[in-house]
Regions:
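Vicinal oxygen chelate
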Residues: 1-2, 35, 46-48, 89-111
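Conserved short beta-strand elements that form part of the metal-binding/catalytic scaffold
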Residues: 30-69
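N-terminal beta-strand motif that seeds the catalytic metal site of vicinal oxygen chelate
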Residues: 1-17, 75-80
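Short, conserved charged micro-motifs
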Residues: 18, 85-89
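Conserved beta-strand-loop-alpha-helix junction that forms the acyl-donor binding cleft
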Residues: 13-15, 37-40, 106
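Conserved active-site tyrosine of GNAT-family acetyltransferases
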Residues: 19-24, 92
Length: 111
């Protein structure tokens, strides 16, 4: 697994298969629970990392559009803590996941 820790987070997606492929097949999360909510016409997939951290994937066919600016309301980014950032980037790239260049946060000095 690529991560040491992350807090619980809920993420909305519109594509069940793509979301499940990305989080389960590429990042290595395990499906802990999957619920179809027929009354809402959606799914909730609870994913678990080896350290017990959870991600709830809400799969909605027509989620509201989000403004693309980073400053827009909603999730801005998802940050993972890793032992070796270069090694983790290399592993992600080998799985076909595009990454940005490694940056240093001017506020906290973290990469």
């Amino acid at each position: 697994m690529l991560f040491d820790s992350i807090d619980h987070i809920a993420i909305i997606s519109s594509n069940y298969q793509k979301a499940k492929d990305f989080y389960v097949d590429k990042l290595g999360f395990k499906v802990k629970k999957e619920v179809e909510r027929k009354d809402r016409d959606d799914f909730i997939i609870t994913l678990e990392a080896p350290n017990g951290i959870l991600i709830e994937l809400f799969i909605e066919k027509n989620p509201p559009r989000r403004v693309t600016r980073p400053e827009a309301a909603g999730l801005r980014h998802l940050a993972f803590r890793v032992q070796d950032i270069e090694e983790s980037v290399e592993k992600l790239n080998k799985k076909g996941i595009e990454t940005e260049e490694i940056r240093i946060d001017p506020q906290n000095g973290k990469r």
